[in-house]
A protein has these predicted regions:
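Divalent metal-dependent catalytic cores for phosphoryl transfer on phosphate-bearing substrates
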Residues: 3-14, 24-25, 43-178, 182, ...
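Short, glycine/acidic-rich hinge or "gate" loops at secondary-structure transitions
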Residues: 35-44
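An active-site-proximal "capping" alpha-helix that borders the catalytic cofactor pocket
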Residues: 17-31
Length: 262
């Protein structure tokens, strides 16, 4: 869960699964004369849209920090065995639907613990912290399965799609976490043949929720995308049950963003 505290102490709460749906919208519209459309299209878009499905368990019973009473941001949640089981459930679920999507989802999950495999130089934020000592088994088991699955696909194409998935993830995370954007994502693939140069994508707030993206990678200009979030009128709670009651009662609010060329 993405937790943003306003100056007045009220909260904006965004489920990881809602953030992922925003990533999926970006993936679905990716591609124009300068940027290659994702391929295989459905598999890449599906992976982006559901890449954080492993957070459903936590979102069903979110909690607070014991010392502050404030809801935990996703970067504060420890990847203990229950959370790792939820991640592996999501990988298995997606793999049953589409093995390629499942492989992308799995590689994304382990990549968060491996510095995104060095494939992205900017931003450096949003990599996983709070890893338990016994997490290496999770990594080894899933990376072994990934290596076996990857033999069925074009490896260069897969890593291009991995970079694209990170790009969709970052765009959504920026939109979810900030009111004013002035950010960079790189390197961003523009083709699958490796001949076209990689892009340095900038995102800057024009006004309100209108965001300029340069170079512009989408099929519609401007592109309207939507995020669902919740707002709560207090920042701290006496116990987890009090927070969950407020969270469950909060009315979902749809926020539209307009992504445009500079």
């Amino acid at each position: 869960m993405i937790v943003r505290e306003r100056a007045d102490g009220t909260l904006i709460l965004i489920g990881q699964t809602d953030h992922a749906k925003l990533s999926g919208q970006c993936a679905a519209h990716w591609g124009n004369q300068y940027f290659a459309k994702p391929k295989p299209y459905e598999a890449v878009v599906r992976a982006a849209m559901f890449h954080d499905s492993g957070w459903y368990d936590y979102e069903a019973s979110p909690t607070i920090a014991a010392d502050t009473g404030k809801p935990l941001n996703f970067m504060q949640v420890t990847w203990g065995k229950p959370q790792r089981r939820a991640f592996e459930w999501a990988i298995d679920w997606m793999t049953r639907i589409d093995p390629y999507s499942g492989l992308l989802l799995s590689k994304h999950r382990t990549g968060l613990q491996r510095g995104r495999y060095g494939k992205m130089t900017s931003p450096k934020a949003f990599n996983t912290q709070n890893l338990p000592e016994d997490n290496e088994d999770f990594l080894e088991r899933n990376e072994e399965a990934q290596a076996a699955a990857l033999r069925n696909y074009d490896e260069a194409e897969f890593w291009t799609n991995y970079q694209l998935l990170q790009t969709f993830d970052f765009i959504s995370l920026f939109l979810c976490n900030k009111d004013t954007l002035d950010d960079v994502i790189e390197p961003v693939p523009t083709s699958y043949d490796g001949k076209a140069p990689l892009a340095r994508l900038t995102l800057k707030t024009v006004a309100g929720t209108k965001i300029a993206v340069d170079p512009f990678p989408f099929d519609n200009d401007p592109l309207r995308v939507q995020l669902v979030r919740r707002e709560i009128g207090r920042g701290a709670f006496a116990d987890p049950a009090a927070f969950r009651e407020a969270y469950f009662k909060a009315i979902p609010v749809a926020v539209d963003f307009m992504l445009c060329s500079p």
